[in-house]
Amino acid sequence: MIGINVAIFTNVQRRTVS
């Protein structure tokens, strides 16, 4: 579950940065 949470968090952060 932690792995999925990290993947979503990274995706959101990457989208925000872009």
Swiss-Prot record:
Induction / repression: Expressed at low levels in exponential phase in rich medium (at protein level).
Descriptive protein name: Protein YtiB
Encoding gene per record: ytiB
